[in-house]
């Protein structure tokens, strides 16, 4: 995929670790001499994949038996709250995953951040003919009059709908609410074809 660039950062974020509230490795979940740990990561969130694979390797080196599962955000948090998984290492707070934490927070424990310099953004292809969000409304036709978004339940989606679109006069653009994999597929297809595209995105990714 060709390079992309940010038009504007509209929310700071912290990447943190969330676990099942009752999660414990003391004498439970053992198979022979190996304790089991179940990690879960969100589809399409590459920084989550990286940190999950890192901790999978670290835990396996310490003698744990580790299972890593990939899901969309909704089923991920539901499964975590239901006890199907022990740890999620890529919780985006306070905005992107806010709705899920509000819904399932009583069943979860926040273990703290590992990256406090993340951000939510609107991004375009590197060679796009605009340089800022202020220019997007008057050049919407160059981007098929669309902003490609992710899941409806994501805080990134709600802040785009409630703050970015009205704040920058983008009400006449079609905000396509889809999924993270669908957004990334649209982004890749457009950049590979040399077309202009505007998406909701985040850093790191």
PLM features per residue range, with description:
Residues 99-111, 194:
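Ligand-binding "clamshell"
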Residues 106-153:
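A conserved helix-loop-strand patch within extracytoplasmic ligand-binding domains
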Residues 24-39, 59-60, 137-144:
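Immediate post-signal peptide segment of exported/extracytoplasmic ligand-binding proteins
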Residues 55-62, 142-174:
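Ligand-binding cleft/hinge of the Venus flytrap
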Residues 43-46, 67-79, 175-186:
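Short helix-initiation/N-cap motifs at beta->coil->alpha
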Residues 85-89, 159-205:
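Ligand-binding pocket segment of bilobal, Venus flytrap-like solute-binding proteins
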Residues 17-22:
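C-terminal motif of bacterial Sec signal peptides marking the signal peptidase cleavage site
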Residues 32-47, 64-69, 144-148:
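Short, well-ordered beta-strand elements
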């Amino acid at each position: 995929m060709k390079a992309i660039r940010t038009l504007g950062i509209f929310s700071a974020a912290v990447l943190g670790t969330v676990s099942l509230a009752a999660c414990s490795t003391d004498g439970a979940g053992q198979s022979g001499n190996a304790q089991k740990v179940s990690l879960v990561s969100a589809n399409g969130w590459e920084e989550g994949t990286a940190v999950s694979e890192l901790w999978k390797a670290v835990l396996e080196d310490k003698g744990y038996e580790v299972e890593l599962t990939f899901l969309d955000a909704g089923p991920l948090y539901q499964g975590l709250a239901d006890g199907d998984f022990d740890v999620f290492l890529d919780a985006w707070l306070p905005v992107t995953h806010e709705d899920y934490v509000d819904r399932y927070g009583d069943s979860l424990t926040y273990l703290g951040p590992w990256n406090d310099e993340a951000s939510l953004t609107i991004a375009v292809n590197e060679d796009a003919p605009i340089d800022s969000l202020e220019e997007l409304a008057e050049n919407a036709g160059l981007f098929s009059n669309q902003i490609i978004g992710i899941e409806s339940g994501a805080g990134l989606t709600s802040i785009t709908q409630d703050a970015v679109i009205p704040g920058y006069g983008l009400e006449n653009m079609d905000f396509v609410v889809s999924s993270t994999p669908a957004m990334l597929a649209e982004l890749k297809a457009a950049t590979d074809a040399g077309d202009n595209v505007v998406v909701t995105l985040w850093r790191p990714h």
